[in-house]
Amino acid sequence: MNDQRKGSDAEPTTHFGYKNVPESQKAEKVAEVFHSVAAKYDLMNDLLSGGMHRLWKRFAIELSGVRTGNRVLDIAGGTGDLTRKFSNLVGPTGQVVLADINASMLKVGRDRLLDLGVSGNVEFVQADAEKLPFPDNHFDCVTIAFGLRNVTHKEDALRSMLRVLKPGGRLLVLEFSKPTNKLMSKAYDAYSFAFMPLMGKLVTNDSESYRYLAESIRMHPNQETLKSMMVEAGFDRVTYHNMTAGVVALHRGIKP
């Protein structure tokens, strides 16, 4: 977090993309972005990743170890890609909670999953990752895919996720990260700051939201920093896997 004070009584600031804003305003500004993009979120994911996001999520599911009867929390679950798969894995004796802080994204996810016939073992909850409204030691697995970079206090969110996991439970963080070679990094910068806003303008008439998304990716901690944050939060056996030359990384940690 970028905590800056202009005086002893000044409110701490944090980054919103490349801008510094008062901490109390970040959640509202992020909400505005996702209210704007919710209706075409799936379409834009496919266009901007060339469908690769489905492969990244599939790998996260394979590494989750989720099985019949488990309880799973899908934070920032959005339109429900992971929740849908987990619903099949846990079966009628398990439970999946799709949690999202954004009401528009939550509605799109609920409507989409109901249209696909996913119900019975899925619950939808509007929740803040920093203050999860669930009991201690409740879930076998917690996932957050492409959501942690939008959280104001990432350390608080990681500790909240640790709290709700059962001992031995797994946290998986799937997030855009730092490319592992200079050529990919340069190409990815050009793609992110030129192509993403352009596609946002053409498809959703909203280039600014996609400019923020590109900036938020650059401001997110790199692979080793996020690993250290997870260890500091209390997770054991923290590892990460780079995908697409580090454009995306999947971090995994275990609750002791």
Curated annotation (Swiss-Prot):
Substrates-to-products reaction catalysed: a 2-demethylmenaquinol + S-adenosyl-L-methionine = a menaquinol + S-adenosyl-L-homocysteine + H(+); a 2-methoxy-6-(all-trans-polyprenyl)benzene-1,4-diol + S-adenosyl-L-methionine = a 5-methoxy-2-methyl-3-(all-trans-polyprenyl)benzene-1,4-diol + S-adenosyl-L-homocysteine + H(+)
GO terms for MF: 2-methoxy-6-polyprenyl-1,4-benzoquinol methyltransferase activity; demethylmenaquinone methyltransferase activity
Residues annotated as binding S-adenosyl-L-methionine: T79, D100, D128, A129
Enzyme Commission number(s) of this protein: 2.1.1.163, 2.1.1.201
Sorted UniProt keywords: Menaquinone biosynthesis, Methyltransferase, S-adenosyl-L-methionine, Transferase, Ubiquinone biosynthesis
Function (record text): Methyltransferase required for the conversion of demethylmenaquinol (DMKH2) to menaquinol (MKH2) and the conversion of 2-polyprenyl-6-methoxy-1,4-benzoquinol (DDMQH2) to 2-polyprenyl-3-methyl-6-methoxy-1,4-benzoquinol (DMQH2).
Similarity annotation: Belongs to the class I-like SAM-binding methyltransferase superfamily. MenG/UbiE family.
Designated name of the protein: Ubiquinone/menaquinone biosynthesis C-methyltransferase UbiE
Organism: Pseudomonas savastanoi pv. phaseolicola (strain 1448A / Race 6)
